[in-house]
């Protein structure tokens, strides 16, 4: 493939993913700079800034951000915010008590713990941090709409002026977030406002 072409870039990406020898040799080295950034966060405002900055790198957390056609005016694109923040598929995985779901939660906890140990964290600390993450995700899940509720197009269409929605989440500076994302808008669709209201509170208390 000619250098610089789309075909060449796709081929390089595929080969890099198949090069397991190099992957094992590098370990978690490629993400060390990002982990250092995360470890340097001192307060929730710095966390918000990091989340906004990382969207430009394709790493999304805290904000379920996107741009797409307005459901009621399909000729216009609009900024969308939706619920996010869970490692499991939806809120049911955090609250259902059947045996299968309980097993999934148990294995998920093991998975999180393993990720910590792979980055050099000792087992005791890894266990503690993994439990803290699952606890936080469970708190976030409480604010999420159910899969059934997500299928309701009316319930999930909530258009706001940015200034008006800002009043509902006073500790999340939307102008700062959008400026850091290089986004300019005065209107947005918020699929699940309760998530962002809960996030506004959780950021200050967790």
Regions inferred by a protein language model and the residue ranges of each:
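Noncatalytic, helix-rich "gating/capping" subdomain that lines the substrate-entry/channel surface
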Residues: 3-206
């Amino acid at each position: 493939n000619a250098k610089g072409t789309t075909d060449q870039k796709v081929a390089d990406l595929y080969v890099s993913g198949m090069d397991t020898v190099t992957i094992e040799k590098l370990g978690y080295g490629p993400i060390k700079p990002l982990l250092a950034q995360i470890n340097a966060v001192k307060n929730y405002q710095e966390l918000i800034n990091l989340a906004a900055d990382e969207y430009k790198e394709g790493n999304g957390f805290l904000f379920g951000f996107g741009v797409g056609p307005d459901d009621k005016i399909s000729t216009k694109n609009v900024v969308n915010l939706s619920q996010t923040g869970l490692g499991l598929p939806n809120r049911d995985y955090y609250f259902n008590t059947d045996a299968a779901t309980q097993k999934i939660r148990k294995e998920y906890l093991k998975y999180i713990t393993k990720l910590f140990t792979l980055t050099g964290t000792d087992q005791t600390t890894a266990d503690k941090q993994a439990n803290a993450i699952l606890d936080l995700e469970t708190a976030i899940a409480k604010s999420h709409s159910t899969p059934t509720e997500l299928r309701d197009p009316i319930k999930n269409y909530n258009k706001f002026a940015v200034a008006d929605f800002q009043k509902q989440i006073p500790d999340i500076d939307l102008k700062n977030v959008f400026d850091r994302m290089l986004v300019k808008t005065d209107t947005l669709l918020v699929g699940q406002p309760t998530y962002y209201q809960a996030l506004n509170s959780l950021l200050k208390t967790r």
